Amino acid sequence: MESGAYGAPRAGGSFDLRRFLKQPQVVVRAVCLVFALIVFSCIFGEGYSNTHDSQQQYCVFNRNEDACRYGSAIGVLAFLASAFFFVVDIYFPQISNATDRKYLVIGDLLFSALWTFLWFVGFCFLTNQWAATKKNDVHVEADSARAAITFSFFSIFSWCVLAFLAYQRYKAGVDEFIQNYVDPTPDPSTAYASYPGVPADTYQQPPFTQNAESTEGYQPPPVY
C-alpha cells in the first residue's frame, strides 16, 4: 500500500502547523465551522420570542417550530462534523494505510455533499417562512433571523467547496493507485519457473541401453 496517498504526505513525518493551516480543506472547513456556529447561535439566542401578554415563546420564522428546529439541527451537526473532520485532517498524514485514508476521504465527500443539499433546503425553508412572518411577530430578533438566513446561504457554497476538495483528493488517490499498479499476469514469452524445493528435470539414460544398441547389427548364426 502506498502511504502517501489521497492528498497527504507519507506517514511518519513530523507535524507541520504552517503546512497544515495552508491546506485548502482546512481553511474551508474552518469557514464552515464558523458559519454553522453563527446559524445555530442566532436561532438559539434570538430565534424565539414571546408577546407582552404571554410568556409562551414561539419561533420568529412565521411561528413555525419546525423552521427553528431544522436550522438549529443542521447548524449543530455541521459544527460537530466540521470539528470531527478538522481532527481527522490533523491525524490524516499519520495514517499509513491507504484503505483507511480512502474511507475517510469518501466519508468527507459524502457528508459534504449531503450537507450542501441540506443547507440549500434550510436556506429555502427559512427564507420562505421569514417572508410569511407577520411584522407584529418580529421585534429585536429581526437581525438574528436575517443573519441565520444569510449564513445558511453562504454555507451552501462553503460545503460545496469542501465536497469538491474531497473529490479531488479521492481522485488523486485513485489515479496514484492505477499508476503504481503492476499487472500480475506473467509474460507468455517467459518460461514458467519451477516450484521451490522441486529439483530440476535430470533425466538419465536407462542402464544397458548403450550396450544393447552397440550389439545390434549383424551377428553370425549359431553353430550346432
UniProtKB/Swiss-Prot annotation:
Region (Disordered): 196-224
Topology relative to the membrane: Multi-pass membrane protein
Domain MARVEL: 20-171
Keyword Transmembrane carried by entry: yes
Biological-process GO terms, alphabetical: regulated exocytosis; synaptic vesicle membrane organization
GO cellular component, one term: neuromuscular junction
Annotated signal sequence range: none
Keywords noted in UniProt: Acetylation, Cytoplasmic vesicle, Membrane, Phosphoprotein, Synapse, Transmembrane, Transmembrane helix
InterPro entries (UniProt xref): Marvel, Synaptogyrin
Main localization, broad class: membrane
Residues annotated with N-acetylmethionine modification: M1
Keyword Disulfide bond: no
Post-translational modifications reported in the UniProt record: May be tyrosine phosphorylated by Src.
Residues bearing the modification Phosphoserine: S3
Residue ranges of the TM segments: 26-46, 73-93, 105-125, 147-167
Cellular compartments annotated: Cytoplasmic vesicle membrane; Cytoplasmic vesicle, Secretory vesicle, Synaptic vesicle membrane
Ranges annotated as biased composition (Polar residues): 202-217
Similarity comment: family membership: Belongs to the synaptogyrin family.
Annotated function: May play a role in regulated exocytosis. In neuronal cells, modulates the localization of synaptophysin/SYP into synaptic-like microvesicles and may therefore play a role in the formation and/or the maturation of this vesicles. May also play a role in GLUT4 storage and transport to the plasma membrane.
PANTHER family per record: SYNAPTOGYRIN (PTHR10838), SYNAPTOGYRIN-2 LIKE PROTEIN-RELATED (PTHR10838:SF19)
Entry protein name: Synaptogyrin-2
Organism of origin: Bos taurus
